[in-house]
């Protein structure tokens, strides 16, 4: 991992925590730009895991594997980090442009080529590579996720409010 560097990627719109800001904790003199880049990747994966675990709790179901697509999915390193953080196999589909694939699936279902979306997916989606979790790495990530990442927002939330007030008062 990042030698104890943990990032909380609260910098985008749509958060249910409007005062939240991105945060990085754990810096020391051993950290390099590599650690920072990796912390960004890991932080995004932690945020996705947090969201998935919320869905699993509400649905009373456990995800057994994860399909990935998009630009980041083209990196073997990112896919492996994702598998290690989630603790389940991650597979890359045959194209990273899955929006087009999804449209084709809907179209073929609508035209009656396939009777169900499940049939269309089964026939049109191909796995190109699977990344199995390294459970030793998962244990480390799980510790950081539960003991650090999940606690960051609660511990920093008062400071986020102060930062928001500061920005309103002193921003140009």
Q: Where do the protein language model's features map onto the residues?
A:
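Glycine/Thr-rich phosphate-binding loops that ligate phosphate moieties of nucleotide
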Residues: 1-172
């Amino acid at each position: 991992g990042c030698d104890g560097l943990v990032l909380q990627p609260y910098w985008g719109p749509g958060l249910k925590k409007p005062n939240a800001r991105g945060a990085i904790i754990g810096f020391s003199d051993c950290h390099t730009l590599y650690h920072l880049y990796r912390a960004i990747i890991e932080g995004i994966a932690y945020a996705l895991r947090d969201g998935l675990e919320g869905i699993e709790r509400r649905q009373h179901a456990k995800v057994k594997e994860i399909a990935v697509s998009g630009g980041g999915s083209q990196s073997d390193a990112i896919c492996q980090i994702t598998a290690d953080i989630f603790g389940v196999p991650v597979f890359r589909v045959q194209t990273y442009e899955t929006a087009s694939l999804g449209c084709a699936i809907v179209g073929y279902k609508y035209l009656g080529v396939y009777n169900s979306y499940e049939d269309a997916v089964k026939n049109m989606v191909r796995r190109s590579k699977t990344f199995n979790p390294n459970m030793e790495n998962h244990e480390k990530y799980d510790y950081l996720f539960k003991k650090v990442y999940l606690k960051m927002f609660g511990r920093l939330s008062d400071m986020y409010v102060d930062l928001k007030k500061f920005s309103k008062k002193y921003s140009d």
